[in-house]
C-alpha cells in the first residue's frame, strides 16, 4: 500500500497488484523499465504480431534484452513466433516470469542468478546454478590428427 499511498491512489484492502495503462512503450515511457514491485503495466495491441513487435521494441529501448519474457497463449504458432523474435534468454509460456529462476515446474535449472548472454553483457545466457560455481580442471593431451587448413574448412573464398 506504500506505493499506492505515495502515488495518491486508494486501493481496496484485498488488492494484490496495481495495473497501470500506458500509451507509449520503450524509451518513451519510464514505466516500461524493469519494475521490482507489484505493479504491472498494460498496453493494448491489435494483433499478436503487433504485441511481439512492441515487446521487442520495449526490450531494446527500455532495457531487458537477454533477460526473461513471458507469453500467455495456447497457440503453438504464437509460441514459435515469439520465441524467434523476442531477444531473451528465457521465454516463459503461461507462467509468471519470476519462475525464470527454475522451479521444478518448468525444467529450467534452479538459479542463484540469471545470465542474459551477450545481449545483456553477460558471459552466459542460462540460469547460473551450482554447476557454474565448481572449479573443473581439464587435462589435454595432444591428439594424433591431421589439422585441416582454413581453405579446407571454409572454402577458397
Residues covered by each model-derived region:
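A conserved active-site cap/scaffold subdomain adjacent to cofactor or substrate pockets
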Residues: 1-8
